[in-house]
């Protein structure tokens, strides 16, 4: 099941910062300079964490927050383009 997730980071070295930003751009949408929102499964999140662990150091900090549907619908920004869309409808195969 997919969930909205908020990922923010504080990377101490510019080269690593660029690498982390490039990886994050492949997984989600930038909301602020070092804050991204992604819509992913738990497995996709683990893949992201694994990729980021390969390029970061112990001094770097990455924060992951999984949002429930109600919390995600209550998240707002000043820019209309950054409004959190509703989760796409999922199909159940019976």
Curated annotation (Swiss-Prot):
It comes from the Bacteria. Its cofactor is Mg(2+). It holds the Pfam family CRISPR_Cas2. It comes from Leptospira interrogans serogroup Icterohaemorrhagiae serovar Lai (strain 56601). Homodimer, forms a heterotetramer with a Cas1 homodimer. CRISPR (clustered regularly interspaced short palindromic repeat), is an adaptive immune system that provides protection against mobile genetic elements (viruses, transposable elements and conjugative plasmids). CRISPR clusters contain sequences complementary to antecedent mobile elements and target invading nucleic acids. CRISPR clusters are transcribed and processed into CRISPR RNA (crRNA). Functions as a ssRNA-specific endoribonuclease. Involved in the integration of spacer DNA into the CRISPR cassette. This is CRISPR-associated endoribonuclease Cas2. Its EC number is 3.1.-.-. PANTHER family: CRISPR-ASSOCIATED ENDORIBONUCLEASE CAS2 (PTHR34405), CRISPR-ASSOCIATED ENDORIBONUCLEASE CAS2 3 (PTHR34405:SF3). Belongs to the CRISPR-associated endoribonuclease Cas2 protein family. GO terms for molecular function: metal ion binding; RNA endonuclease activity. GO terms for biological process: defense response to virus; maintenance of CRISPR repeat elements. The keyword S-adenosyl-L-methionine does not apply. Mg(2+) binds at residue 10. Keywords: Antiviral defense, Endonuclease, Hydrolase, Magnesium, Metal-binding, Nuclease.
């Amino acid at each position: 099941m997919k969930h909205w997730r908020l990922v923010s980071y504080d990377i101490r070295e510019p080269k690593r910062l660029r690498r982390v930003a490039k990886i994050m751009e492949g997984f989600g949408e930038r909301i602020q300079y070092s804050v991204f929102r992604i819509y992913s499964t738990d497995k996709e999140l683990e893949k992201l964490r694994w990729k980021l662990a390969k390029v970061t150091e112990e001094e770097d900090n990455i924060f992951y927050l999984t949002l429930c549907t109600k919390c995600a619908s209550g998240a707002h920004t000043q820019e209309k383009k950054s409004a959190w869309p509703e989760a796409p409808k999922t199909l159940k195969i019976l």
